[in-house]
Amino acid sequence: MAPNPRKSHPLLKMINNSLIDLPTPSNISIWWNFGSLLGICLLTQIMTGLLLATHYTADTTLAFSSVAHTCRNVQYGWLIRNLHANGASFFFICIYLHIGRGLYYGSYLYKETWNTGIILLLTLMATAFVGYVLPWGQMSFWGATVITNLFSAIPYIGQTIVEWAWGGFSVDNPTLTRFFALHFLLPFLIAGLTLIHLTFLHESGSNNPLGIISNCDKIPFHPYFSLKDILGFMLMLLPLTTLALFSPNLLGDPENFTPANPLTTPPHIKPEWYFLFAYAILRSIPNKLGGVLALAASVLILFLIPFLHKSKQRTMTFRPISQLLFWTLVANLLILTWIGSQPVEHPFIIIGQLASLTYFLILLALFPLTGALENKLLNH
């Protein structure tokens, strides 16, 4: 029999083992679609970003007008920009749902896959932040000023780090140039980390909604899940194009229609919606260093999740108390997102503080306690 190049060629063999003949649990649900959706998001962002970079000028005097020029004079420049800006939102929607799936179904017990995933999240957050600064609108400038300034809370070396990051004594031309360089570079780092993430995943194979070993019941990835993934792509790209074509500025900040001006501060400085939960946690602590530590902890706490798993069952499928707690956490994050968009005044301050406390309480104390309680209930 003639050798099949798909199974013998060194490169095709890797693709075959990852995307075609990959043994996949037969019962994985639509929640397992988000990994491939994140891959499509990354590809879309790199392609649209590359096209935007060809028309962008990383200079404080020209950045704003170069973006306006792209939208007005470049063929379909407006569409490319709208897809890129809103694509970031969809990227974060997918990654948050992907992490939520991991939490609910105990996928974090694949520690290497989980940890590389968190590093991917942090890299994505950094990429989105530096990218937001590039159009050089008011909120871009002041967002960059406020967030980079947080590093000055680090004792002794903080101020030096900030001035080193800025390339001067304030956010200016050197800052914009290096942010553009970073924004161009980081997506390729994300692509590399994704391959590591997948390598670790394929060491163990996918988890499934029951959280049990599924070696006895696996099916090939293609055609079953490749087809299911294509359906997922369509279901994501349709709302993305709808948003980009009908209301591209829905999720943006109106302040960014004003060119950056270091002399006037916007009334409410706030980041894009996908960072609002962390921003609310930052603001809920009246001390600068305390706020920065809470902000860092709000994301880095994910590294602790595998060690806080006390249940005998992997997933929450048959754990109703943990399910209730999980959805409480989701509601809590939505409240934090809303609070982050509100001005710092009563009653928003106290709501934000309570929601921040509840966030850490659920993850650090209530999840492990509930797991232990459910183990006890199983024995009776």
From Swiss-Prot:
Record's keyword annotation contains Iron: yes
Binding-site positions, a ubiquinone: 202
Pfam families the UniProt entry points to: Cytochrom_B_C, Cytochrome_B
UniProt keyword annotations, A-Z: Electron transport, Heme, Iron, Membrane, Metal-binding, Mitochondrion, Mitochondrion inner membrane, Respiratory chain, Transmembrane, Transmembrane helix, Transport, Ubiquinone
GO biological process, one term: mitochondrial electron transport, ubiquinol to cytochrome c
Residue positions binding heme b b566: 98, 197
TM region positions: 34-54, 78-99, 114-134, 179-199, 227-247, 289-309, 321-341, 348-368
Chief localization: mitochondrion
Bilayer disposition of the protein: Multi-pass membrane protein
Subcellular location: Mitochondrion inner membrane
UniProt keyword Transport, yes or no: yes
UniProt GO cellular component terms: mitochondrial inner membrane; respiratory chain complex III
PROSITE patterns: CYTB_CTER (PS51003), CYTB_NTER (PS51002)
One GO MF term: metal ion binding
Matching InterPro entries: Cyt_b/b6_C, Cyt_b/b6_C_sf, Cyt_b/b6_N, Cytb/b6-like_sf, Cytochrome_b, Cytochrome_b_C_euk/bac, Cytochrome_b_N_euk/bac, Di-haem_cyt_TM
Binding site for heme b b562: 84, 183
Signal sequence bounds: none
SUPFAM superfamilies recorded: a domain/subunit of cytochrome bc1 complex (Ubiquinol-cytochrome c reductase) (SSF81648), Transmembrane di-heme cytochromes (SSF81342)
Entry note: cofactor: Binds 2 heme b groups non-covalently.
Cofactors named for this entry: heme b
Subunit structure: The cytochrome bc1 complex contains 11 subunits: 3 respiratory subunits (MT-CYB, CYC1 and UQCRFS1), 2 core proteins (UQCRC1 and UQCRC2) and 6 low-molecular weight proteins (UQCRH/QCR6, UQCRB/QCR7, UQCRQ/QCR8, UQCR10/QCR9, UQCR11/QCR10 and a cleavage product of UQCRFS1). This cytochrome bc1 complex then forms a dimer.
Note from the entry: Heme 1 (or BL or b562) is low-potential and absorbs at about 562 nm, and heme 2 (or BH or b566) is high-potential and absorbs at about 566 nm.
Family: Belongs to the cytochrome b family.
Function: Component of the ubiquinol-cytochrome c reductase complex (complex III or cytochrome b-c1 complex) that is part of the mitochondrial respiratory chain. The b-c1 complex mediates electron transfer from ubiquinol to cytochrome c. Contributes to the generation of a proton gradient across the mitochondrial membrane that is then used for ATP synthesis.
Entry protein name: Cytochrome b
Organism: Buteo buteo
